[in-house]
Amino acid sequence: MSQATKRKHVVKEVLGEHIVPSDQQQIVRVLRTPGNNLHEVETAQGQRFLVSMPSKYRKNIWIKRGDFLIVDPIEEGEKVKAEISFVLCKDHVRSLQKEGFWPEAFSEVAEKHNNRNRQTQPELPAEPQLSGEESSSEDDSDLFVNTNRRQYHESEEESEEEEAA
């Protein structure tokens, strides 16, 4: 299987399925990533340990601090005590909360995480359009603005001076 095909299947699996943790599995929150595909996590009871990322997720799915995971315990592990079995996105968290499988200790953290995502995504005001009127090509208000670039504003006075010279 090619790398692109593998990535497609892994992303489809992570985004599509809504799973429920089994008796052995735990829902944990990522605290930090020390490296080597290891992540330090915290359980709902406050226990901290390292989890490993399986090879199918490596370079396909990215995990950041504050994300939630479902992990399978590893019996023989001293430092690394579990392996990631599923990465939870916002939709998965909401469905687990509705079904009653979400730990109470993570309820406040999940709400803050969802609210923070809502605040960082700017909402564009909807422009009412008349039925016979098309949007003009001169109106650029709906275009994406790259905030990482400086905005240069040229005044009319400067442009007139350049034309005269």
Swiss-Prot record:
The modification Phosphoserine is found at residues 131, 135-137, 155, 159. The keyword Phosphoprotein applies. Residues 155-165 have a biased composition (Acidic residues). A motif (Nuclear localization signal) lies at residues 6-12, 56-65. One of its GO terms (cellular component) is intracellular membrane-bounded organelle. InterPro entries: EIF1AD, NA-bd_OB-fold, RNA-binding_domain_S1_IF1, TIF_eIF-1A. Its main location: nucleus. Coiled coil: none annotated. Pfam families: eIF-1a. Residues 5-89 form the S1-like domain. It is found in: Nucleus. One of its GO terms (molecular function) is translation initiation factor activity. The keyword Transferase does not apply. Keywords: Nucleus, Phosphoprotein, RNA-binding. Residues 112-165 are annotated as: Disordered. The modification Phosphothreonine is found at residue 33. Interacts with GAPDH and STAT1. Plays a role into cellular response to oxidative stress. Decreases cell proliferation. Belongs to the EIF1AD family. This is Probable RNA-binding protein EIF1AD. It comes from Homo sapiens (Human).
